[in-house]
Amino acid sequence: MGHKVHPTGIRLGIAKDWNSKWYANKAEFASYLAADLKVREMLRKKLAQAGVSKILIERPAKTARVTIHTARPGVVIGKRGEDIEKLRKEVSQLMGVPAHINVTEVRKPELDAQLVAESIAQQLERRIMFRRAMKRSVGNAMRLGALGIKVNVAGRLNGAEIARSEWYREGRVPLHTLRADIDYGFAEASTTYGIIGIKVWIYKGEVFDFSQVGQEKQDDSPRNDRNDRGDRGDRPSRPAREAR
């Protein structure tokens, strides 16, 4: 079933953390959720050129804290912080409470699945061959330390009359392993022939301690070979057979 479920949703609380962190009673839950969706939609539309990876929303004590993970923090902040102040006012208006906006830089965008998917989408819109775009992104991710990456594109590839899907993979992408730290991203490319969907899975290792989610993880060591089983302890030696 690893191929039929959202890779992030099935790992919440195991290897992934929530993008919205707040508690609401039954009467407020729907309005809070709708406000989160509107804020994310507005920010992604206004920051389309800023390389936004994800948007975290927290609601501590009748205020709101929005953290934007982006590959281009300068585009978000603007000249002397003018742009981010405008965003803060719009977010406060949408959420109905005072809002604070924090900006976090994504230092390795080649290892962020959402940014990789958006990069491939932009290349397809510039009429670059889809296979070249896929292989370039896969090569960059593996070069920067990913343990595995898979890219899937679907639609009227190269303007073909019949839509199809093609994928390319390097390394391991264990979708059935719940403790696997798999980053998932999706983007759409609007071409003259129609919409092309891009899905990206990036495997970064395994998570053994949920409290360390979001921090840098060490590469998982390979399993021992069957011959390397270590000492099995003292065993009584068998008596040698007498020659007949």
Curated annotation (Swiss-Prot):
Residues 39-107 form the KH type-2 domain. One of its GO terms (molecular function) is structural constituent of ribosome. Keywords: Ribonucleoprotein, Ribosomal protein, RNA-binding, rRNA-binding. One of its GO terms (cellular component) is cytosolic small ribosomal subunit. One of its GO terms (biological process) is translation. Residues 213-244 are annotated as: Disordered. Part of the 30S ribosomal subunit. Forms a tight complex with proteins S10 and S14. Belongs to the universal ribosomal protein uS3 family. This is Small ribosomal subunit protein uS3. It comes from Xanthomonas euvesicatoria pv. vesicatoria (strain 85-10).
